[in-house]
Amino acid sequence: MKVDAPVRKAYWLVCVFALSFFGCQQQPPQSVPPIAAGIEHLLNDSGLQALGKKLFFDADLSTPPGQSCAACHSPEVGWTGPDEALNKGGSVYPGAVHSRFGNRKPNASAYATLTPQFHAVREGNEVVFVGGDFWDGRATGWKLGNPAADQAQGPFLNPVEQNNPDAEAVLAGVCRSSYAPEFRSAAKRIWGIDDACKADTDFAYGIVGLAIAAFEHSPAVNQFSSKYDFYLKGKATLTADERRGLELFEGKAKCANCHTSRPGPNGEPPLFTDFRYDNVGVPRNPDNPWYTMPAEFNPDGEKWVDRGLAEFLAEIPQYAMFAQANVGKHRAPTVRNVDVRPTPSFVKPFGHNGYFKSLEAIVHFYNTRDVLPAADKVNDPKPGVNCWPAPEVAQNLNTTELGNLGLTAEEEAAIVAFMKTLSDGYQPT
């Protein structure tokens, strides 16, 4: 697409104001606010949110048509994977080409826009990484000013997801859609572009990412309407089990060390994540279909190991030196909506690879990972009963905040009861 003068002018304006002061460069920012300067007004724009919703649910923006963002991020399951059969097994979802699979469980897209841009902080002698979207942080937010906006562009072009050959193909689909007038209108109203369908490809594709992020930022997605939210406002009462679970969550079980549960300094609702990276020792999921993907996608085959954050750090010159110290680490997800499901018996997987098939299972793992023997040391191994499989990655294991928490079965159940109060859609009586 040819760039005319008005578009070049608009691009400069968007770099300065709309995409934050860091949006024109692929470099890590020096300081990172919760939502980067100049981006919040876009995320709160109701017209951009409405456009983003149509993009999010459009199944015609894949090659072949048939896969929308919602295929892996569905509201009825807390904006993550809605296919119970897949959840029970590998927990990784197929792409538009149904024989192709990715390598990790879909993250929840709710509350993702509140993730800070990917950055490093120094704590004593340690460099700690914070923020970024995807399990490995590679959607940094350095491009469009918000990690969720960067993330929204990724699946469209991933051959194991929506499989479009390039951004122009995505834009062609947008421009022939029923909502193409809204795309043009938003571009004209916000950025002064006469026709977004004839604008610079990178710029127009940036609008797509920003619009999807705006929808994900809307009250329809980031609801803050759980029982716990009402409890914090004094409008709901926790049961005895839920109160006990909250006490354990913030105390003995150490959950709140990573899944922050208290309001922010200005009363902001808690996000239940510190956006940092840990290796909690999740076992390999033998049902992960990534192991059987062709060599063009997975050259390591059955020997593939999920290196997590390290894989991304190794690609960034200024951070590559920290890759080894972060092998096996994945970003702590929010635990908001962890129990949202269409029916009480519906199976939701947990962990970056979906190894755990219930909240009870992953809480028990955090409690007993270092207590039960390794699976290869027992006869008739039953994970979670008489053993746990070895971690997929044994190095950089977090041994200070989980593994031997000393919780009773009743205390584990209380923690699960509390986590169930984090589901949006609660109706106070």
Could you tell me what each predicted segment is?
Residues 1-7:
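N-terminal secretory signal peptides that target proteins for export/translocation
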Residues 24-429:
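Periplasmic c-type cytochrome electron-transfer domains
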